[in-house]
C-alpha cells in the first residue's frame, strides 16, 4: 500500500456541481506545484469517481478511495 499522507483531497462546491482536487504536499504541509488531479461531478461521489478515472497514479487513487 502506498503512503498517501502527503496528498490532500478536497471537495469544493462550484456552479451547482462538486470539484474534487488532490494536491501534493511538501514537508511543510503546503501544496507543491500543480494539482495532482482535479475533476467535476454532480455529487462528491461522482467527482471522486471522475478523478479516479482520470489518473493512473496509485497513491492518488488510494487517497481518493480513502475519502
What kind of feature is each model-predicted range?
Residues 1-2, 63-67:
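Short intrinsically disordered terminal tails
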Residues 1-21:
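Short N-terminal "domain-start" leader segments
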Residues 6-9, 24-25, 49, 66:
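Positively charged, low-complexity intrinsically disordered regions
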Residues 25-49:
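A short, exposed loop/beta-hairpin motif centered on an aromatic-Gly-Thr core
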Residues 52-65:
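Short arginine-rich
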